[in-house]
Amino acid sequence: MSMSDPIADMLTRIRNAQMVEKAVVVMPSSKLKVAIAQVLKDEGYIDAYAVKGEAEKPQLEIGLKYYAGRPVIERIERVSRPGLRVYKGRHEIPQVMNGLGVAIVTTPKGVMTDRKARAAGIGGEVLCYVA
């Protein structure tokens, strides 16, 4: 059976792995998941990520980050989902926790944070909030 929302599955795997203090979480890979992992790494929410395995079924490994025994990611939640897509224009992209968190947005120029999308003057689909 196929998965209906692979991005929600990715976020849930990260959330669950951090609750049990795992160092690494493994999941099926896709181009969009790798792009989201790159944004999380650039923003300092994860240590590293790598795509491993054979070409037919690549696996994405994400190294989770902790500070003083607590997960760096306090909150990670899906916004746009298959049943209700959430698109925002360049002036409507929300701030997360008054700028302390990030919204990950997929735009025509690629996957980026809310700050970069606002600076570039482009809108897109709001995938998730991370704080």
From Swiss-Prot:
Looking up InterPro entries in the UniProt record yields:
Ribosomal_uS8, Ribosomal_uS8_CS, Ribosomal_uS8_sf
Subunit-level organization:
Part of the 30S ribosomal subunit. Contacts proteins S5 and S12.
Give the matching Gene3D superfamilies.
Answer: 3.30.1370.30, 3.30.1490.10
Q: Keyword set for this entry?
A: Ribonucleoprotein, Ribosomal protein, RNA-binding, rRNA-binding
What protein family does this chain belong to?
A: Belongs to the universal ribosomal protein uS8 family.
GO:BP terms for this protein? translation
- Protein function: One of the primary rRNA binding proteins, it binds directly to 16S rRNA central domain where it helps coordinate assembly of the platform of the 30S subunit.
Query: What GO molecular functions are on record for this protein?
Result: rRNA binding; structural constituent of ribosome
- Its protein name is Small ribosomal subunit protein uS8
Q: Which organism is it from?
A: Methylibium petroleiphilum (strain ATCC BAA-1232 / LMG 22953 / PM1)
